[in-house]
Amino acid sequence: MTQAQIQPVKLGTQGFEVSKLGFGCMGLTGAYNDPLQEQDGISVIKYAFSKGITFFDTADVYGANANELLVGKALKQLPREKIQIATKFGIASRGFPDMKIEGSPEYVRSCCETGLKRLDVEYIDLYYQHRVDTSVPIEETVGELKKLVEEGKVKYIGLSEASPDTIRRAHAIHPITAVQIEWSLWTRDIEEEIVPLCRELGIGIVPYSPLGRGFFGGKGVVENVPTNSSLKAHPRFQAENLDKNKNIYERIEGLAKKHQATPAQLALAWVLQQGEDVVPIPGTTKIKNLDQNIGALAVKLSEKDLREIFEAVPIGDVAGGRYYNGLDHFSWKYANTPPKDSKIST
């Protein structure tokens, strides 16, 4: 397959330009696999940039702050003005089966200040609310983000796993540039409400886990899930469900051969070609996987191809929920906030 060129695209309608394929940095400090050594993690980021990826995604909670620090160190070896850094705030603690979500104005500002220090930058290109605090009116959270934009500390604002009502209300306070949300061949529940709303409002869509948390790359099928991986607790990777889901992988594998692509490339190409406003952020710790992901840009799919791939993964055939057990209430479907001028006491 010919080497794919990564074109710049506009994310949202405020002028934010990013590479059509982004890179999710979470796994570099450990999540589905062991964390990489610091220099190895920096090398992966630098390699991605050398191949044309300029849009890098991190968060304060990844690796308990280590991820932002790692990205910041990599940035020191790259031209800052050519890179777009997205980071996130909002998950105050990451317990299991519960997380503490915080969206007060004071918390927003505190996280931004510490994020700037960890990344060692003067501004954050895209700052997301990682999860919605359902006890704080979204107008208060976004109101503080708007101030950070006015102060030059943040360039663009995003939301992650936000409900339609929350997106609309947030956008009325300050333009939302991007919504980051799970979207892949086996997670398509955003297509009825979230995608049309984002397009109505001119908001870009940043799919996370576009390869189904590695499933379409063969994780759990052609390679074992590491014993210390968080995927061990994920419903779709549980033994009985995984056995059923292997049928889905085999179908995509068959279609991939027709397109001279790997299953991962076909699955990622399907996401990439959902629209110009769609910028997925697959992550990996391996250079060969990164090269494969970039190769997905060279897989050209017709409307008929896209439909055939879509129909090869009937959502009713997917065994297991998309969210870890006990964490469903943190998904976009439950991410409404109280009316403005009211708060839920906690």
From Swiss-Prot:
SUPFAM superfamilies: NAD(P)-linked oxidoreductase (SSF51430). The keyword Oxidoreductase applies. Its EC number is 1.1.1.-. The keyword NADP applies. Substrate binds at residue 130. Keywords: NADP, Oxidoreductase. The active site is at 62 (proton donor). Expressed in roots. Detected in leaves, stems and mature nodules. GO terms for molecular function: aldo-keto reductase (NADPH) activity. Induction: Not induced by auxin. Up-regulated in leaves by ethylene and salt stress. Down-regulated by abscisic acid. It is an enzyme of class 1 (oxidoreductase). Signal peptide: none annotated. One of its GO terms (cellular component) is cytoplasm. NADP(+) binds at residues 209-218. Belongs to the aldo/keto reductase 13 family. May interfere with the nodulation process and inhibits nodule development. This is Probable aldo-keto reductase 1. It comes from Glycine max (Soybean). The gene is AKR1.
